[in-house]
């Protein structure tokens, strides 16, 4: 496994990361999560990405149990904030960012995350408030760096222009050989500003592995065969 720097930061990450959407804390239990995590470590992967909303917090909880068995300095841990955790807990306000980072750290059983990401933009909160809150999280030692997922170039630019705010080091768009829209504007803009790409769905939920055939049922041991997880396949 090769390694790269995460944007303009000092964080070195493996080119391949292990994510947890649709799996850990949902259709995949702790025993299998631990097996996957150990296999990732054995392969040289040091980058693990999750989000508070995955499994309603369950993905972070399961990984917290699994990762506490590894030296904290041996891996890079990323999580996210934005989507609803309850009817009233959502968004990127100062209150929510501080509340949700603390909740994520408790579930993950760690004092800090290496990367804290805005899971989506929040049009209801001034960008200045969001960026200031993210900066406060970093200054408090609860996150080393910040990033975003699925922001437009205009939204990224607005965040970068907030005075004295922490700068983004990562972008997480959907990007794979089927969906290449980020190549038009997002990736070139990020390259100019020292922002790395951490893509989600790089294998299009497994479609690009070749294990799913048109008109045939999915393999029994695949996520697409699970009633808990096959809804994500509808887009393909």
Question: Would you name each region that the model predicts?
Answer:
Residues 3, 37, 60, 64, ...:
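Generic structural signal for well-ordered alpha-helices
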Residues 6, 18, 33, 40, ...:
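Conserved, mostly hydrophobic/aromatic
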Residues 11-16, 44-46, 71-75, 109-114, ...:
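Short, well-ordered coil/turn segments that N-cap beta-strands
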Residues 25-28, 51-60, 84-85, 122-126, ...:
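Acidic-and-aromatic substrate-binding clefts and catalytic sites of carbohydrate-active enzymes
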Residues 27-40, 91-109, 154-160:
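Short, acidic/polar
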């Amino acid at each position: 496994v090769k390694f790269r720097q995460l944007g303009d930061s000092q964080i070195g990450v493996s080119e391949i990361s292990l994510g947890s959407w649709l799996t850990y804390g949902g259709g995949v239990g702790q025993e299998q999560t631990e097996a996957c995590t150990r296999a990732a470590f054995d392969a040289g992967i040091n980058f693990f990405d999750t989000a508070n909303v995955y499994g309603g917090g369950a993905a972070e909880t399961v990984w917290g149990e699994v990762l506490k068995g590894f030296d904290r300095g041996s891996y890079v841990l990323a999580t996210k904030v934005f989507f609803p955790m309850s009817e009233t807990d959502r968004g990127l306000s100062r209150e929510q960012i501080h509340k949700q980072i603390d909740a994520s750290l408790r579930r993950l059983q760690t004092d800090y995350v290496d990367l804290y990401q805005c899971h989506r933009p929040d049009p209801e909160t001034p960008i200045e408030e969001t960026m200031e809150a993210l900066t406060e999280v970093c200054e408090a030692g609860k996150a080393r760096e910040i990033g975003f997922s699925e922001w437009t170039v205009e939204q990224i630019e607005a965040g970068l222009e907030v005075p004295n705010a922490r700068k983004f080091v990562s972008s997480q768009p959907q990007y794979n050989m089927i969906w290449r829209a980020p190549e038009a504007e997002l990736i070139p803009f990020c390259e100019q500003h020292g922002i790395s790409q951490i893509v989600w769905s790089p294998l299009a939920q497994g479609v690009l592995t070749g294990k799913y055939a048109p008109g045939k049922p999915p393999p029994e041991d695949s996520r697409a065969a699970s009633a808990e997880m096959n809804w994500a396949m509808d887009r393909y």
